[in-house]
């Protein structure tokens, strides 16, 4: 359970940073366009001081925004959280595989204990590497898992990818 939750939270945090990056770029482009327009207006009409003042204010805002967002490398933050989400997903799948092998009886008790220890060590290592997330990412993950059932796959969805003879719900 924890692996699935942590995976989804990391995924949602990566989405947040992606959206922040997109909005930041749009704002930067918009302000750059306004600054350029103001400079062109000054060149065309050198006598109007309003263009000069407005352009100076926009340029100052642009500089402030650029300096502020230089502190945040949203692309790198997004990448880090995506990579961590994948690590948690792989760990969850490894636990699922262990449970399947236990149910199938293909592992001895010693093998189960050894694999469980290995997975626990991986869990500890990944936990140490996992970056902190926001409360918003947690809430979006909660909605995705509890309400939207993001991690639940129906038999119908599984059957789509199987050959006809392996499907549970044959047509």
Residue ranges: model-predicted function:
Residues 31-47:
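Juxtamembrane "helix exit" motif at the C-terminal ends of alpha-helical transmembrane segments
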Residues 1-30, 68, 72-171:
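Conserved non-transmembrane functional hotspots
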């Amino acid at each position: 359970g924890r692996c699935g939750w942590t995976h989804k939270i990391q995924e949602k945090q990566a989405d947040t940073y992606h959206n922040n990056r997109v909005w930041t770029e749009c704002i930067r482009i918009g302000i750059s366009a306004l600054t350029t327009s103001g400079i062109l207006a000054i060149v065309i009409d050198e006598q109007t001081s309003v263009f000069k003042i407005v352009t100076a204010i926009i340029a100052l805002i642009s500089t402030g925004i650029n300096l502020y967002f230089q502190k945040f490398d949203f692309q790198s933050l997004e990448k880090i959280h995506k990579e961590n989400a994948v690590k948690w997903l792989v760990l969850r799948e490894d636990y699922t595989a262990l449970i399947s092998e236990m149910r199938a009886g293909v592992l001895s008790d010693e093998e189960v204990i050894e694999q469980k220890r290995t997975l626990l060590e991986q869990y500890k290592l990944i936990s140490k590497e996992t970056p902190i997330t926001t409360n918003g990412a947690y809430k979006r993950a909660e909605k995705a898992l509890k309400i939207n059932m993001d991690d639940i796959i129906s038999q119908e969805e599984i059957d789509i990818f199987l050959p006809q003879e392996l499907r549970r719900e044959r047509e």
